[in-house]
């Protein structure tokens, strides 16, 4: 029982710390991703990821890249704690019941990743709603000058609750789970495979310590692959989440959004922002997982 408590504390501390570190560094790239993805094909003011970054800095200032960050900093600590706790315990649950072979299988890594995301999403989805509303505010205000202007993260949360209720904060929960559940499942499946392959090449046991460059490389590759594969789902999710319930609903769900986007904008719309998504997710995941593994290795003898 004591070991379980110690393990839980280890996963919570290392998960929370690693998540905050990565989000602090990668938030500006996420702002660019959100701005690019909400633009319709043929009506874009940005010519690509780096053009969007330059225009935002030029027209709105560097500080705009950190729009929505206060809510991210507040939410990422408990969200990442739940996320890594869910992943580690899901793997352990399978190992305890079906043996180490099943515990280290790809299907277990995928399933544990999905469970981890489902737990983290209880906090991440409201955070995402607030963050993305702030990130795209300049664009949406041009379309509807009469809508409420959010003065910051906590003001946005208050207004959303007042105007849309708790459902407003969980708008797009299922699309978010349908996007990030598979993403995290694919991510951990690829990451664990990379880790075991590298360990084998270095003649190490899978659970042995790997040097930081290998952890970063595995995390980056897994993140880039998973981000590219799930980009169409992310476009749909983002379009749904930035809608306000007080406005006309263009997108009424995942399937309706898919049909509407395909009909009005064509297949190209589903890869909008892929570059920004990869450059937000891949380095962010590399930083998160490498710092998580490092902190877990350092703290395990202290807790």
Swiss-Prot record:
Residues on Mitochondrial intermembrane side: 1-8, 89-109, 193-215, 290-303
Topology term for the membrane: Multi-pass membrane protein
Subcellular location: Mitochondrion inner membrane
Gene3D superfamilies: Mitochondrial carrier domain
Protein name listed in UniProt: Mitochondrial substrate carrier family protein E
GO CC terms in record: mitochondrial inner membrane
Main location per the UniProt record: mitochondrion
Gene that specifies this protein: mcfE
A single MF term (Gene Ontology): iron ion transmembrane transporter activity
Upper lineage: Eukaryota, Amoebozoa, Evosea, Eumycetozoa, Dictyostelia
One Pfam family linked to the record: Mito_carr
Transmembrane segments: 9-29, 68-88, 110-130, 172-192, 216-236, 269-289
InterPro entries xrefs: Mit_carrier (IPR002067), Mitochondrial_sb/sol_carrier (IPR018108), Mt_carrier_dom_sf (IPR023395)
Protein role: Mitochondrial solute carriers shuttle metabolites, nucleotides, and cofactors through the mitochondrial inner membrane.
Signal peptide, first to last residue: none
Organism: Dictyostelium discoideum (Social amoeba)
PROSITE patterns reported in the protein's UniProt record: SOLCAR
Record-linked SUPFAM superfamilies: Mitochondrial carrier
Mapped Solcar repeat ranges: 6-93, 104-197, 210-298
Keyword entries, A-Z: Membrane, Mitochondrion, Mitochondrion inner membrane, Repeat, Transmembrane, Transmembrane helix, Transport
